Amino acid sequence: MMKIVIDLMGADHGVLPIIEGVSRALENKSFSAVLVGDKDKATPFISKELASKVEMIHTQDYIKMEEAATEAIKRKESSIYLGMDILKNGADALISAGHSGATMGLATLRLGRIKGVERPAICTLMPSVGKRPSVLLDAGANTDCKPEYLIDFALMGYEYAKSVLHYDSPKVGLLSNGEEDIKGNMLVKETHKMLKAYDFFYGNVEGSDIFKGVVDVVVCDGFMGNVVLKTTEGVASAIGSIFKDEIKSSFKSKMGALMLRNAFDILKQKTDYAEYGGAPLLGVNKSVIISHGKSNARAVECAIYQAISAVESQVCLRITQAFESLKPSVSAHQSDQQDA
């Protein structure tokens, strides 16, 4: 049976939403859950039925948000270190809503990078007007990048879209300040030249194209990706607040909202971060899902489904195979340019 490790510590709202999310997921999927965290804090929220389905690893130590990510390397009794150790030694996936930097650092050091991957990347799903979301990476793991890193992100995003999301022939776009080949900073221009070696490359895309579904995968450095992600979250939250205020403003607005309830439900589902679960860390040798610090039970539940899909689709193996077969084409392309 698939074994999934869940870090209980460090989330904004404590252990309760995480435990509730695990409980809901176990009602719908068959997997073995290992909870790592403070047993004294967790036990009051774990029913007898749930206790019979999960394994509890006790520790009170965890990496606080204000602490440096490097602390995780020293703190071998912290929840994320213990969880990563369990993952390394036989578990199939790990989910954490705690310190994302600590999770990324330990995943890279303890699990190792897939051969050929220079930098792992955070991959996140973005809402789209189409029937399926867009994939964005890097969403914050690497703020300073070289073109070679973005090539890695493109390959990993392509494989994730194809293997886990089952997108047929996904197209990859490079985020820029214009669609034309000449647009972008030096990083974008150099990456664009290298990505031309791949059939899946669509070309440059603008920020608005992310939500239009112009391409399936959008590649950028982690600084830009995180700005896009946080801006999107802020806009979605602001629009939601505006809607609520306007609906409450008059009886006519309330009646109109009732008539549009189904449409609002669909809109919420498409724009609610919780429905997307978490963000996979691609490029390490096991499946790691980084959840939002403010994750509610639904977000944790969906993150578990995400982890199950990643393991079942063997995404780490698919990325390994992609780097063996596809990445050499970049070197060949660069050699051709030099010869020319």
UniProtKB/Swiss-Prot annotation:
Entry EC no(s): 2.3.1.274
MF terms (GO), sorted A to Z: phosphate:acyl-[acyl carrier protein] acyltransferase activity
A single Gene Ontology CC term: cytoplasm
Keyword line: Cytoplasm, Lipid biosynthesis, Lipid metabolism, Phospholipid biosynthesis, Phospholipid metabolism, Transferase
Catalysed reaction, written as an equation: a fatty acyl-[ACP] + phosphate = an acyl phosphate + holo-[ACP]
Main location: cytoplasm
A Pfam family the protein falls into: FA_synthesis
GO biological process: fatty acid biosynthetic process; phospholipid biosynthetic process
Cross-referenced InterPro entries: FA_synthesis, Phospholipid_synth_PlsX-like
Class in the EC hierarchy, top level: transferase
Record pathway: Lipid metabolism; phospholipid metabolism
Cellular location(s): Cytoplasm
Role, per record: Catalyzes the reversible formation of acyl-phosphate (acyl-PO(4)) from acyl-[acyl-carrier-protein] (acyl-ACP). This enzyme utilizes acyl-ACP as fatty acyl donor, but not acyl-CoA.
Classification via HAMAP family: PlsX
Subunit description: Homodimer. Probably interacts with PlsY.
Family assignment from sequence similarity: Belongs to the PlsX family.
Protein name, per record: Phosphate acyltransferase
Species for this entry: Helicobacter pylori (strain HPAG1)
Gene expressing this chain: plsX
